[in-house]
From Swiss-Prot:
It comes from Herbaspirillum seropedicae. This is 3-demethoxyubiquinol 3-hydroxylase. The keyword Metal-binding applies. It is an enzyme of class 1 (oxidoreductase). Belongs to the COQ7 family.
């Protein structure tokens, strides 16, 4: 019975995330900031970058849900739950910014979510240390990616920049929390594969 309840809960969460029905526990850091004037090309570029970030948060929801579901220790399950709440903030913030820019979330969100959930399930089955190691490396790569977006976003796009900067701060904390809980270092080939997969996702999500 518990397994069925958990399955229903996960399915409900997936539907909410895919359809953008999410809630923020903290105010959007970009809300209310004055936006500078942007050309249509700059708006499209900013929207593409924020769509990539939104997809990253869709994946984060799936990863953390799966990793927390199949983690072995209660302490680690709770850590994933706490981080997932902050990641849901990011999802809500990026979706709001996309609407402000007159754009939309990725049409492939069901695919992104499903793929990430499978990856998270596999990582969790490898044991808590490797499960946390996957988080640590993911957050390290995401931090690097967000730093790149701060360089690429239009200088006058104050709202997007505020959102991305707070996301970056949160991802650093999530990675450190995973290491504090005993994350194992991921092998170099695995890191390379993760980076390659992220490259495919960011390239496609920028456009679709």
């Amino acid at each position: 019975m518990q397994f069925v309840d958990e399955l229903i809960s996960d399915f409900d969460k997936a539907l909410r995330v895919i359809n953008g029905v999410v809630f923020e526990s903290r105010p959007n850091p970009g809300r209310g900031l004055p936006d500078g004037v942007m050309s249509e090309a700059e708006k499209r570029h900013a929207a593409g970058l924020m769509r990539v970030n939104n997809v990253g948060e869709v994946c984060a929801q799936a990863l953390y849900d799966a990793q927390g579901r199949f983690a072995q220790k209660a302490e680690i399950k709770n850590a994933f739950a706490r981080a997932g709440i902050e990641e849901e903030d990011h999802l809500a913030w990026t979706a709001e910014r996309l609407r402000e820019l007159g754009s939309h979330t990725s049409l492939l969100n069901p695919l992104w979510y499903g793929g990430a959930y499978v990856l998270g399930s596999i990582a969790a089955r490898l044991g808590d240390a490797r499960n946390l190691g996957f988080v640590s490396e993911t957050e390290r790569q995401v931090e690097h990616h967000l730093m790149g977006h701060l360089d690429k976003l239009p200088a006058q796009d104050n709202r997007s920049r505020a959102i991305v900067d707070q996301m970056r701060i949160d991802e650093i904390e999530h990675g450190q929390a995973a290491r504090d809980l005993g994350a194992a270092e991921m092998p170099a080939p695995v890191k390379g594969l993760m980076k390659a997969m992220a490259k495919v996702m960011t390239t496609v999500a920028y456009r679709i």
